[in-house]
């Protein structure tokens, strides 16, 4: 009984360590984003002294000056948290690689604070500001890596090894996919509605809202440069985007119809059930492609080229080459989701710029953190279909760890985007709050390891990106 109690107490203490480490990491991230915001609002110039304002000890004379002071106070608190986290890790005999990584972050922290003090006293200096930004993001990334490693050790299955080949064959021993009755209703009106719903399903409408938000964010970012955003350009770009997504989804249905019949969650798709004839679906996809390219061409030729590339990449490169052949299909395939950011930017500016590339990078890095949750939830289904998704090939423990890693990289890229595009407080709050929520559910996934937990993390990833994209639109158009 005493041994069981000691084990339970140790598990609780380790959970607290993970909570403290995650809180410290997000605290560092908060400092980075608030620091970017203070630079944007010239708050640092309103309090150009250290540790407070004026002669070094005077109170601020303006609201933005108080923002700078608040940033420094929070920096002290987070620094204390970093030291406490390291101390708790030592007390709990956390594994060596985690302790070393946390120690590196704790060692870099006062150096980072000193650079911040120099920036505050000497005023804005590009070199020092870049060093300060990179330093803060590096500390955050270091702590996030330590968190992922510790969660892997404490919650992972030590017996789990890579037993599945890099390209698994469809597993015939798994339960068969459920039967689905494709019969159309006898009533002509109901039959027409059922057919219409089937064609709508081919376009994968659930993907459209988020990818349209990505394109919208790209357009509004482009409008802050030399670009001009008009209602006509916005409507044509979003219309072309919706149709290109629909075309890509339709071709995906066509090419995966045989595999869809083997998988539980896709066995009721229109082509898998012969609800829509294959050649009709192909013609439908071609029609959507043509109209999409026409709309993009009306905006500009580069947008049309990128739209065509997006359709080909998702339909051919991802569906035929990446998804069935490599465990890195999700990572490389993230380029398909990133292209709408460039299309939105190009639609307004006419060329590819740093802002569009920065937003595309955020989407690219977010994709594995987002989709690996779905891969965990449907691991058995993907194995049945013969797809080498990470949980199938490398195991669930490795996949959960990668969710944390890719989330951390996403937040780093989001911080870089805030700096490049001078985004404000709304963006900072959205990225911090929803990033913390995503991290919370990703950590919870490590402990619960259920399908429901994977879906919670999946939905949290959607909420994060949606909130960040809306914040970009708000910051660029309203503020």
UniProtKB/Swiss-Prot annotation:
Keywords: Cell membrane, Heme biosynthesis, Membrane, Transferase, Transmembrane, Transmembrane helix
Alphabetical GO biological process terms: heme O biosynthetic process
Region of interest (Disordered), ranges: 155-186
Protoheme IX prenyltransferase, as annotated region: 208-476
This protein's pathway: Porphyrin-containing compound metabolism; heme O biosynthesis; heme O from protoheme: step 1/1
Annotated catalysed reactions: heme b + (2E,6E)-farnesyl diphosphate + H2O = Fe(II)-heme o + diphosphate
Remarks, miscellaneous: Carbon 2 of the heme B porphyrin ring is defined according to the Fischer nomenclature.
Family: In the C-terminal section; belongs to the UbiA prenyltransferase family. Protoheme IX farnesyltransferase subfamily.
The protein's name: Protoheme IX farnesyltransferase
Native source species: Haloquadratum walsbyi (strain DSM 16790 / HBSQ001)
């Amino acid at each position: 009984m005493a041994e069981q109690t000691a084990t339970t107490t140790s598990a609780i203490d380790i959970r607290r360590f993970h909570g403290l480490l995650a809180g410290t990491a997000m605290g560092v991230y908060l400092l980075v984003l608030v620091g970017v915001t203070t630079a944007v609002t010239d708050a640092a110039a309103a309090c150009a002294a250290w540790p407070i304002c004026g002669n070094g000890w005077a109170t601020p004379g303006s609201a933005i000056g108080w923002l700078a002071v608040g940033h420094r106070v929070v920096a002290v608190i987070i620094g204390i948290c970093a030291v406490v986290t390291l101390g708790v890790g030592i007390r709990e005999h956390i594994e060596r690689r985690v302790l070393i990584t946390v120690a590196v972050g704790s060692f870099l922290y006062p150096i980072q604070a000193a650079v911040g003090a120099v920036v505050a006293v000497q005023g804005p200096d590009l070199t020092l500001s870049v060093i300060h930004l990179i330093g803060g993001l590096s500390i955050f990334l270091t702590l996030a890596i330590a968190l992922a490693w510790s969660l892997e050790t404490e919650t992972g299955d030590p017996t789990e090894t890579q037993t599945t080949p890099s390209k698994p064959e469809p597993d015939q021993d798994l339960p068969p996919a459920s039967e689905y009755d494709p019969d159309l209703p006898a009533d002509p009106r109901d039959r027409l509605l059922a057919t219409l719903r089937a064609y709508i399903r081919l376009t994968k409408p659930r993907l459209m809202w988020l990818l349209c938000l990505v394109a919208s964010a790209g357009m509004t970012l482009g409008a802050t440069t030399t670009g001009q955003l008009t209602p006509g350009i916005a409507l044509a770009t979003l219309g072309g985007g919706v149709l290109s997504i629909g075309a890509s989804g339709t071709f995906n249905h066509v090419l995966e119809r045989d595999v869809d019949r083997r998988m539980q969650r896709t066995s009721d798709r229109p082509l898998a059930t012969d609800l829509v004839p294959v050649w009709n679906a192909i013609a439908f996809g071609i029609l959507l492609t043509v109209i999409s390219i026409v709309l993009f061409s009306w905006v500009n030729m580069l947008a049309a080229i990128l739209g065509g590339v997006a359709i080909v990449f998702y339909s051919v490169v991802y569906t035929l080459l990446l998804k069935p052949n490599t465990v890195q299909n999700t990572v490389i395939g993230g380029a398909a989701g990133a292209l709408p950011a460039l299309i939105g930017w190009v639609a307004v500016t006419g060329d590819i710029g740093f802002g569009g590339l920065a937003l595309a990078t955020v989407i690219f890095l977010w994709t594995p953190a987002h989709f690996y949750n779905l891969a965990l939830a449907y691991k058995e289904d993907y194995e049945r279909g013969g797809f080498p998704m990470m949980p199938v090939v490398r195991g669930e423990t490795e996949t959960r760890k990668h969710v944390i890693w890719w989330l951390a990289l996403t937040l780093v890229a989001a911080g870089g985007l805030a700096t490049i595009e001078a985004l404000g407080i709304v963006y900072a709050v959205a990225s911090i709050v929803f990033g913390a929520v995503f991290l919370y559910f990703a950590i919870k996934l490590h402990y619960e390891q259920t399908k429901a937990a994977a879906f919670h993390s999946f939905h949290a990833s959607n909420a994060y990106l949606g909130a960040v994209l809306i914040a970009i639109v708000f910051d660029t158009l309203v503020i």
